[in-house]
Amino acid sequence: DEANGEIPLDDGVISRDGWAVLDDSAANVIVEAYEVNGKPNPLGAWVMPRDHAETDFYFFGYGRRYTEAVQDFYKLAGPTPLLPRFALGNWWSRYYRYTQDEYLQLMDRFKREGIPFTTSVIDMDWHRVDDVDPKYGSGWTGYSWDKQLFPDHEAFLRDLHERGLKATLNVHPRDGVRAFEDDYEAVAKRVGIDPATEEAVEFDLTNPDFVSAYFDMHHRMEAEGVDFWWLDWQQGGVTRQPGLDPLWVLNHLHYLDSGRYETSSERNVNENCECEKCAEPGARDEHEMHVEQSERNVSCTERNNRWPLTFSRYAGPGSHRYPVGFSGDTIVTWESLQFQPYFTATASNIGYGWWSHDIGGHMCGYRNEHLEARWYQLGTFSPINRLHSSNSQFMGKEPWNFSAEVRDSMVGSLRLRHMMLPYLYTMNYRAAFEGMPLVEPMYWADPNNPQAYEVPDEFRFGTELLVAPIVSDNDDSAQLGSTEAWLPQGEWYDFFDGRRYVSAGESGRRLEVWRAIDRMPVFAKAGGIVPLQQLGEGNKVNDLGNPESLQVLVFPGANGSFTLKEDDGSVASAASGS
C-alpha cells in the first residue's frame, strides 16, 4: 500500500546466475483432517504447524532455462487456475459512497457511451461504516448492507447481472462479527456465544466452528447475487497458530470455497433436472440429498459447480493458486506508473501471473491527464484491467471528465481491451495448462542476450505481442510521448498501423519510439496472428459470449499459426483444457 515508485521485491525461482533457493521451512502444511481441536471439520483438510523443526529448501538449478524453472515450480506448487472470461474484461472500481441508483445510472451511461465493463467492484461502503455505534469499534469490518445507500441490495445485484456485470464486494474481515451485524445471532450461536451478551465473535481461522459460520455468512450473500469477494486484508500476519499467516489461509480457504458445489440451501434444486433424486418427494427440501445427487448427476452438476475466483493480496510463494491478486493502494504519480510494468513482469519469476493494479492510481499524487491516458493504455495490456480511485472528487476515472483528446484515448483503450477477449482467453488457457504467464519479462525468451535485461519496462504479452509502454509525460516541444524500446532479432510490426521494423543483428535493435497520446508502442512478431472480437452495440457492448465473428489481425514476414480457445462458459468445459 501507498508505494510511490520502486519498492524491493522478493526473490523468484530463477536468477541470472543460474540457480535459486526457495526456503519453505517456516510454512505450515495442509493435512487431511475431519476433526480439529476436538471439533468436526466439514472442510476435510486443515492447515497445521509442522510437527518438528526442519529445514525445507527447494533448489532450482536450471541455468538460464527460466521458462522451464517456472513450469517445474508449477508442478511442485500447483498450476495457475483458469480464470472465468469476465475477469479478463474491464473492471469498474472506486472507493466512493455510491447509492444504488447512482451506481446503476453510471453503468448505464458507460453503455450509452459504448464503453464495455464486465465486472463491478463495490468498495467497502456497501456495508455499514459511519453509523456503527462506537462501542462496537470502527466500521472498517462489516457484513451488513447499508440500507441508506442500498435500500434493496438484492434488486441492485440483480440489476447488475441484467446489465451483463459480475459483482464483487470489498471486505476487511479482521474485526470478526459484531453485535450490530445482520448475521450476528446465527454466527454467535455457532461458536458458543450467547447473543444476548453482544460479545464480539473473534475472527479466528484456527477455529473450525468460526470458519464454518464465516463461510455460511458469505454463502447467504452469494445466494443474493454476490459473485466473488475482494479480501482486502491489511491487519498483519498473526494468528493463534504459530507460523500461520492469516492472509495465506484466507486466500486458500476462500478460493476452495468459491469453487464449491452450491446446495439447495443456497439455490433452488434444478427444476428441469429429471434425475431420480430430484424427482423424489421432498427432494427440494433435503440439503444432503441434493448434495449427493449433484455429485453424480450431470444436469445438476453443470448447474451448481461454481467457477472459483477470489481477489486478494499476495501472501508469498504459491499465491498464484488463488487468483486474482490485488497489488495495493497506489499513489497517482508517474513514478507509480513507471514501476508497474517491471513489477508485473517480474512477478512471473515466482509464477504469479494475474495481478490487478489500481489502474489510473488510487490516491494522493496529482492530476495529470497524460498520466491517466498512459495508465489506461498499460491497463489494456495488463493481466487484469481494473480502474480504481479514491473518493476524492478530483480522482474519478470516468473518461468524460477529461479533455476530448484524452477522453478518446481512454475510451479507445477500454474498447480495445474488450475486443481482445478472444486473444486473452486463449492466453488464459496457455497460462493454466502450459504454465506460461500472460506477461513475461523480455529475458525469458532471450536469456543470453544482455539487451533483454536492459528494458525493465518492456514485456511480452502472450505469444504474439511485445509491449513497451510509455511511462513518462509528453515532450513539451514535440507533444509526443516516448520510450526506449528493444526489438529482438527479426521483423516486427506496429500493432496499430502495421509499420514494419527490422531488427537484423543478433543483439536486437534499440530505438526511441515516439507516440501521440492515443497510441502506445505495441509490436506484433512476424507471422503473428491476433484474434479480436467486434464490439456489440447498446446492451451488447459488454457481451461475454463466444463471438459470432472475429477480426483477425495477421502480420506478414513469416509463417504463423494460432489455436483459438473457446468454451461454453461452464467449469466442466473449461476444466478439460481442450
Give residue spans per PLM region.
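Accessory, solvent-exposed terminal regions and/or long lumenal/extracellular loops of proteins
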Residues: 522-578
